[in-house]
Swiss-Prot record:
Full protein name: Kinin-2
Residues passing through the membrane, by range: none
UniProt keyword terms in alphabetical order: Amidation, Neuropeptide, Secreted
Lineage: Eukaryota, Metazoa, Ecdysozoa, Arthropoda, Hexapoda
Keyword flag Secreted: yes
Protein's job: Mediates visceral muscle contractile activity (myotropic activity).
GO biological processes: neuropeptide signaling pathway
Compartments it resides in: Secreted
Amino acid sequence: DASFSSWG
């Protein structure tokens, strides 16, 4: 999820 958070 943290990775996707970077994408927005």
